[in-house]
């Protein structure tokens, strides 16, 4: 993770980088395949400690990983955002942890590894933790929505967790957010800049480069996203 000092009134930030490939390299291509995610007990314990520490220090927290969190079996729809990975442990394990800290709850659960022995056990009492200001989870390309609120597949739970990602890599497939690229020009790439207002809990996003149309105006590249739930 890395901490960044910010000025008043927005405060300072902690960005936590997660590793979804936290397993023995010898398992890749056999037990574990491409576009899947597996975490270790050590990483989960570290994440919990790092989140507790950030809350105690009054830092605004952002997590980041190539994948978003959610169920990869979902269809491509606006309502049900779909990550680009199959999670071999529960895809809502880390959202469960963040949620328990946010709402100061006890979390006692075992998240089983579908492909091996990396079962994750969490037995934590977060009732005494300091207030956690969780801003968002940043991820890479996705084939459905670029901004969405994390929720259980069956709609039984909505997390106070905002997911923000980039546009899909190409116009291939059935992606909702298809973008047009012109090879050898600035419109071959696409990226965003984020401005975070921690007072009003808004994120202002500015997109650059390739867009959904060749005539995408500057106003069409601007969006305001609330993380106040």
Regions found by a protein language model. Give the residues of each.
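Solvent-exposed loop/turn segments at secondary-structure junctions
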Residues: 20-24, 67-71, 141-146, 168-172, ...
């Amino acid at each position: 993770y890395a901490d960044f000092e910010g000025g008043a009134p927005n405060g300072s930030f902690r960005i936590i980088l997660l590793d979804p490939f936290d397993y023995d390299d010898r398992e890749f291509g056999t037990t574990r395949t491409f576009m899947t995610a597996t975490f270790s007990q050590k990483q989960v314990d570290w994440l919990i400690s790092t989140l507790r520490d950030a809350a105690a220090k009054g830092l605004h927290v952002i997590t980041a990983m190539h994948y978003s969190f959610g169920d990869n079996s979902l269809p491509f729809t606006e309502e049900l955002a779909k990550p680009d990975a199959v999670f071999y442990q529960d895809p809502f394990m880390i959202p469960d942890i963040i949620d328990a800290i946010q709402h100061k709850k006890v979390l006692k659960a075992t998240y089983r590894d579908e492909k091996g022995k990396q079962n994750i056990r969490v037995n934590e009492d977060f009732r005494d933790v300091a207030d956690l200001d969780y801003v968002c989870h940043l991820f890479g390309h996705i084939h459905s929505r670029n901004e969405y609120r994390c929720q259980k597949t069956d709609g039984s739970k909505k997390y106070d967790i905002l997911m923000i990602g980039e546009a899909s890599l190409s116009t291939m497939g059935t992606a909702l957010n298809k973008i047009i690229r012109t090879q050898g020009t600035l419109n071959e790439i696409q990226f965003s800049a984020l401005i975070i207002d921690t007072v009003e809990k808004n994120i202002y996003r500015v997109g650059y480069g390739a867009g959904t149309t060749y005539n995408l105006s500057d106003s069409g590249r601007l969006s305001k996203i609330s993380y106040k739930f």
